[in-house]
Amino acid sequence: AIMKYGVGVKCATITPNAARVDEYGLKKQWASPNGTIRGILDGTVFRAPILVNNVHPFVRTWTKPIHIGRHAYGDVYMNREIKVPGPGTGELVFTPRGGGEPIRKVIQEFESSGVLQGIHNTVPSIRSFAAACFTYAMDQTIDLWFSTKDTISKIYDAEFRRIFEEEYEANWKEKFEEAGIEYFFTLIDDAVARIMKSEGGMLWACKNYDGDVMSDMLASANGSLAMMTSVLVSPHGYFEYEAAHGTVQKHYYKHLEGETTSTNSMALIFAWTGCLKKRAELDETPEVGEFAKKIEEASIETVESGAMPGDLMRVADPDPKNRQVSTEEFIDCIREKLEEKL
């Protein structure tokens, strides 16, 4: 549907473990739906915090939003794994198409049982990731940080670094200098340390797994996993908007038992408004974009008025008007704010 219409919204999905296979009667432990979709669409996931004036970052130095650019293709999300049964040789083999001598590397001489994993990426996908990140940083007028571990991964991670530097020198260096922003590379562990001491205000470009982990850390440090926007920008012109969190399983089970839940729907609301704004841009229907903007404003104003779900209630600035509302009450409060704007 996204490939047909160009824009879509994806709700949270389950990547089943053994318990979920039994619970839902699945045929097997299916692969990650996100990984499958991103493998088809390719591209980069951009995430940014949803800011409200009564919830502040836990990191005191962060005075500007930190954006994440996560490569959405390959690596561990499209891996192949082997459970090694016993002693033997684990090899990495590449067989050229159309003939030629295979390239072989011994990974490990196993003396016992163990595990093996193969991952991959492609130069075109890495290049589109780099181009998307430079474009995003230029559009937002913010610095671009990129981090890998090329001191350890001297071919795999080093290829990412090489392509980013090549893209910067060939297409972006002069533009960045004119805009007063910079491209900065450092190792992933050093980047984490620097981020924690920074004032924010940059796009942090990460490989797939790094971006998966760090985007959740940033969202939580800004108040909640539900306080972050997320959009997959495909090099083929597709846009997939989603909530950056999971299925909120514990809340769902409470709901099934008839208990009242207080679930934060901000990320899902902003997924839909982001989609509507992109649809308005493509269809040249500005009134649709204005409607989406008013929904976002109503959502933020609701939280700032003191009506908020439990996750924000625990981290919001103390105020007598603060009150925890249920899942449905929160949506009703947003609706009331929206109706005032229409």
Task: Please report, for each region that a protein language model flagged, where it lies by residue.
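Glycine-rich phosphate/diphosphate-binding loop of Rossmann-like nucleotide-binding domains
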Residues: L92-T186
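Glycine-rich phosphate/nucleotide-binding loop
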Residues: I195-K294, A298-S305
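Short acidic loop-to-helix transition motifs that present clustered carboxylates
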Residues: T186-A193
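Glycine-rich phosphate/pyrophosphate-binding loop and the adjoining helix
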Residues: A72-G74, M78-A130, T285, K293-L342
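N-terminal glycine-rich phosphate/adenylate-binding segment common to multiple enzyme folds
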Residues: A1-P102, Y209-V213
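Flexible, glycine/charged-enriched surface loops at secondary-structure junctions
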Residues: D139-T148, W172-F185, A280-A292, T302-V315
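Short glycine/threonine-rich loop-to-helix capping motif typified by GTGT followed
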Residues: K154-E165, I195-L203, Y209, A219, ...
